[in-house]
Amino acid sequence: MISKPDKNKKRQRRHARVRSKISGTAECPRLNVYRSNKNIYAQVIDDVAGVTLVSASTLDSEISGGSKTELASQVGALVAKRAVEKKIENVVFDRGGYIYHGRVQALAEAARENGLKF
């Protein structure tokens, strides 16, 4: 019997394919996005050292109110602000296998507006 592939499995395969090609360094770390049904998380990661340099999510106390897309843009602004404070300006954007639309797009555009270059 033919079964429809699981959406999350397809996303994980896309993400693995992209991750094999991109990697974050200390000079140009990776801005990773994870999206759950309720929250969105963003991390700036140095893959060489295996360290998270900066992170932000909708669970942070600075983020409040609005739709999920508005919250995602607040997370993007917050992660960019924290990265710029640590003198990180250039990043590689890792959309985590998600389509560049909606919450992922809102986070990316807010991060760009607040000083990150990618």
Curated annotation (Swiss-Prot):
Chain spans, region Disordered: 1-20
GO molecular function, one term: 5S rRNA binding
Keyword Ribonucleoprotein (UniProt): yes
Keywords: Ribonucleoprotein, Ribosomal protein, RNA-binding, rRNA-binding
Keyword RNA-binding: yes
InterPro entries for this protein: Ribosomal_uL18_bac-type, Ribosomal_uL18_bac/euk
Compositionally biased region (Basic residues): 7-20
UniProt xrefs under CDD domains: Ribosomal_L18_L5e
Recorded superkingdom: Bacteria
GO cellular component, as recorded: cytosolic large ribosomal subunit
GO biological process: translation
Reported function: This is one of the proteins that bind and probably mediate the attachment of the 5S RNA into the large ribosomal subunit, where it forms part of the central protuberance.
Subunit structure, interactors included: Part of the 50S ribosomal subunit; part of the 5S rRNA/L5/L18/L25 subcomplex. Contacts the 5S and 23S rRNAs.
Stated family: Belongs to the universal ribosomal protein uL18 family.
The name this protein goes by in its record: Large ribosomal subunit protein uL18
Organism field: Pediococcus pentosaceus (strain ATCC 25745 / CCUG 21536 / LMG 10740 / 183-1w)
Taxon lineage: Bacteria, Bacillati, Bacillota, Bacilli, Lactobacillales
